[in-house]
Amino acid sequence: MAGDRPPTPFCSMTSNEKNVKVKIFAVLVRGEDDEVERDNVRIACEGVMRLEDGRVEIVYEETLGEEGTAINTLSFSVEEPNVVTLARDGAASCVMTFSENCRYRGTYHMGYLSFDFTVATRRVENSVRFDKGGVLILDYNTEMQGVSIQNSKFRFTITA
């Protein structure tokens, strides 16, 4: 029901925000040796990019299949574009921080179930600018209790 969903982030624009197209291509690899499972994910959606207090935010809605939807916010400082935060709010919620060769802990919340994880980032390349969009690449490993559960490579293309 529409009343149960968070408000759409695509309304009344100011000079510090604009509508953008968000294209996501991801390669997700789980398992090892003969038990490797590989998924290629492609998502294209509308979003809003904001510039406020030296931070760029890109907000977009993602459909998670049977779990429902999530509002995702990618953000970074203009001065440190290669330290990126992804906040997901919805049926599955979490906050992840990506900085090359760094590890950050987080908690994934899925209704009544929560679990801790670690993001070990291998690579961050960010050419996204508020005035022209760009490309963000995130290459990272997700671990639970020190065990790798998924390798992820994301490419976000942001265009006005």
Where in the sequence are the language-model features?
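Mixed-charge, glycine-accented linear interaction segment located at domain edges/termini
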Residues: R129-A160
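Long, hydrophobic N-terminal alpha-helical segment
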Residues: F10-Y60
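A short, structured loop/turn motif at beta-sheet edges
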Residues: S15, M49-D53, S77-E80, H109-Y112, ...
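Hydrophobic/aromatic beta-strand elements that line small-molecule binding cavities or substrate pockets
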Residues: E46-M49, T73-F76, G106, R123-E125, ...
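Short, hydrophobic/aromatic-rich segments at coil-to-beta transitions
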Residues: E17-K21, E52-V59, V83-T85, R103, ...
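N-terminal amphipathic/basic-hydrophobic helices that include classical n-h-c signal peptides
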Residues: M1-M13
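Short, well-structured hydrophobic secondary-structure segments
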Residues: N40-C94
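Acidic, glycine-rich flexible loop segments
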Residues: G90-V135
